[in-house]
Amino acid sequence: MAGSDTAPFLSQADDPDDGPVPGTPGLPGSTGNPKSEEPEVPDQEGLQRITGLSPGRSALIVAVLCYINLLNYMDRFTVAGVLPDIEQFFNIGDSSSGLIQTVFISSYMVLAPVFGYLGDRYNRKYLMCGGIAFWSLVTLGSSFIPGEHFWLLLLTRGLVGVGEASYSTIAPTLIADLFVADQRSRMLSIFYFAIPVGSGLGYIAGSKVKDMAGDWHWALRVTPGLGVVAVLLLFLVVREPPRGAVERHSDLPPLNPTSWWADLRALARNPSFVLSSLGFTAVAFVTGSLALWAPAFLLRSRVVLGETPPCLPGDSCSSSDSLIFGLITCLTGVLGVGLGVEISRRLRHSNPRADPLVCATGLLGSAPFLFLSLACARGSIVATYIFIFIGETLLSMNWAIVADILLYVVIPTRRSTAEAFQIVLSHLLGDAGSPYLIGLISDRLRRNWPPSFLSEFRALQFSLMLCAFVGALGGAAFLGTAIFIEADRRRAQLHVQGLLHEAGSTDDRIVVPQRGRSTRVPVASVLI
């Protein structure tokens, strides 16, 4: 078995510690043709033989994962849909409101590496079942917190991160073990449609359930029931495919996992993974800020324009902007994800660097439109919505492509760990702190102006302009990814095919001549 610690295997000059990867453009031995470096893709019959699952069953598993992904994001942004009511109920300001999202993301970020480690080594189906069941109970409990205990709301939102971490680090790796090549890209695009659609449904459900029930607490009681359905679907429908078998094109046992520290070292030395994660961090910063603050900003804009009454203590706040922003998020997400995947798929045949270049174009293109949406808010709410629509469409082009990049530059036994640390990085520097940072800047700016509805609007307007600058930095990170993407992808392919192996820290090697080349094998395999 290629991944065994005791079986003999090649460790030639293409080992990362020994020399460059063959087939890399510009290096000796390179064909210069990216198509020739692509591994053979198994057909439907081959996939069924390797995974033990029919095409219909595999598609059904993806459908269940999409449902849960949609549910997770729906729950996350339900809070944003009723944020003005939460501020009134708990009597808190913008900075405290930003803490709601920051605490959730922080716990999610801390727990992600734990589930990443477990997901690379244990049954992924049962890990997700336990996490989502716990998340459903905690979410339901958060809807019964009295107004004088805001800290309890923060605590429960932090515990919700358990369910998110158990799912987000594991689900994409299941899809990677069911499909390959263009089929995997299509399935990932379907999976990541759930992010903007679920986010939009969260705004819509939060605002509409609040209006129907007359109490914002009921908005938090919708998703727990749907979470129970998700656990049942996971238990009854999802089956665990062998890790990495579809890429090795054989029914041999999957690659053996290496130590956690070896995984971390390999990921840190993978420039495509590191730079694409930094680019995705910028996406998380911008989307996290807009997710929490855009409806509140639009409401303040309407108040300044005289189109809606202000949100006063004791009154129910207008939810029309949450509804409209939710619809925009759904539409732009579907359009952006689909557009990004299709453009990348078409360009990939002629340019192997298409994926990071499309991501860079999306981020760099979204920055000026987001800036214009903020600048125009005091003059025309219609123009603001138009620019938000364009900016969010370009921003959404990244979701599925970034996931695809990770899956083909990281070997199967490290993917959950890679997903986890991409989550940690993107949230640590992205949406864990961005809602709080935006709220903090807004509060500080308001202190310098006389209290008024205009000063509340201007403070949030100026603080949100930081998003356009961060988006431009993210585009630069994706341009850097394009420099390394070909070599890193080829290295991962060679490793999966058993043609490239990393020397373990405790694995003594000897050199055996073979056809004029040195072949390194473990001492244990020779003694046996």
From Swiss-Prot:
Record note on pH: Optimum pH is 5.0-6.0.
Pfam families the UniProt entry points to: MFS_1
PTM-bearing positions, type Phosphoserine: 518
Domain of life: Eukaryota
Annotated TM spans: 50-70, 98-118, 127-147, 160-180, 187-207, 218-238, 278-298, 323-343, 357-377, 381-401, 421-441, 465-485
Modified residues annotated as N-acetylalanine in this record: 2
Gene3D superfamilies (UniProt xref): MFS general substrate transporter like domains (1.20.1250.20)
Molecular function terms from GO: transmembrane transporter activity
Chain intervals for the UniProt region annotation (Disordered): 1-49
Membrane topology category: Multi-pass membrane protein
Chief place of localization: membrane
Reactions it catalyzes: a 1-acyl-sn-glycero-3-phosphocholine(out) + H(+)(out) = a 1-acyl-sn-glycero-3-phosphocholine(in) + H(+)(in); 1-hexadecanoyl-sn-glycero-3-phosphocholine(out) + H(+)(out) = 1-hexadecanoyl-sn-glycero-3-phosphocholine(in) + H(+)(in); 1-(9Z-octadecenoyl)-sn-glycero-3-phosphocholine(out) + H(+)(out) = 1-(9Z-octadecenoyl)-sn-glycero-3-phosphocholine(in) + H(+)(in); 1-(5Z,8Z,11Z,14Z-eicosatetraenoyl)-sn-glycero-3-phosphocholine(out) + H(+)(out) = 1-(5Z,8Z,11Z,14Z-eicosatetraenoyl)-sn-glycero-3-phosphocholine(in) + H(+)(in)
InterPro entries assigned to the protein according to its UniProt record, in alphabetical order: MFS, MFS_dom, MFS_spinster-like, MFS_trans_sf
GO BP terms, alphabetized: lysophospholipid transport; phospholipid efflux; regulation of lysosomal lumen pH
CDD domains (UniProt xref): MFS_spinster_like
This protein's UniProt keywords: Acetylation, Lipid transport, Lysosome, Membrane, Mitochondrion, Mitochondrion inner membrane, Phosphoprotein, Transmembrane, Transmembrane helix, Transport
Oligomeric form and interacting partners: Interacts with BCL2 and BCL2L1.
Functional description taken from the UniProt entry: Plays a critical role in the phospholipid salvage pathway from lysosomes to the cytosol. Mediates the rate-limiting, proton-dependent, lysosomal efflux of lysophospholipids, which can then be reacylated by acyltransferases in the endoplasmic reticulum to form phospholipids. Selective for zwitterionic headgroups such as lysophosphatidylcholine (LPC) and lysophosphatidylethanolamine (LPE), can also transport lysophosphatidylglycerol (LPG), but not other anionic lysophospholipids, sphingosine, nor sphingomyelin.
Similarity-based family: Belongs to the major facilitator superfamily. Spinster (TC 2.A.1.49) family.
Listed name of the protein: Protein spinster homolog 1
Organism: Homo sapiens (Human)
